[in-house]
């Protein structure tokens, strides 16, 4: 978009402009923000970005809603994150403040924008600095409080929490044994919202990269494994001998027991169990609790190739020989940089784009 047009649009967004003119200009900007080129042009004009943030607090619901939708679109583009935070330093504090308001009608849009902004490590670090420990506690309370905001579902708090746990500081908060955070999240593995459910599974998967916490996660204080396996289990019959190896919550399931419907979530659940197999003690505990039986039946049922491959990796871990001496902890094995880069690229290609855009 022509820079001159950006400046012209900016003049229409001023408070003294007629409300209908301001609304039309904003509607045009919303359309522009739907393309990568449009987002690049908008982010090149700091005053326009500041005006958009101001308009998101407009008294006119239609104007405020469109402004929030533009912000969601802008934050969906990782290339725009640095410019957004540099040009609008009040963006994160302002959004977090409004998200905490239990009466905010645009909380879901704000939550989606914050989720977009926290995807990349650099902006996630900025987010955590703005949030503080107290803010993390508030986010958790909001996620766990039924109807915290009657006007919003706040389902994107799940993926937001997942993004924050890509960093050690975020994982440290979730894994704080004095806060019982993990235990509070486990019921949401059965949430009716795919977005929330997937975010919680992703959070747990990220936390399982901390191998020093595996014994605690698998122990009686958390007992994570049955929560991960139950969504992967169907209603297949097992022999009495096999049944006794399964955790109590997975025994004698109804014949019509349904597995997790979303293939991406099934894949993340399998990957989380695989991470728990990184240490020798973890592998022993996972093997002892009938995990192979659940994976065997899942593999026969599964139709999605990427989930089937993840299942095969875990089965190989469960039935394969133990690693040689010195390689018992698989999370501490050194991977050559070129191989690590290739594997990371393949993972990203398999996952696809993650940003949420308003169409």
Curated annotation (Swiss-Prot):
Pfam families: DUF383, DUF384. Belongs to the HGH1 family. This is Protein HGH1 homolog. It comes from Xenopus tropicalis.
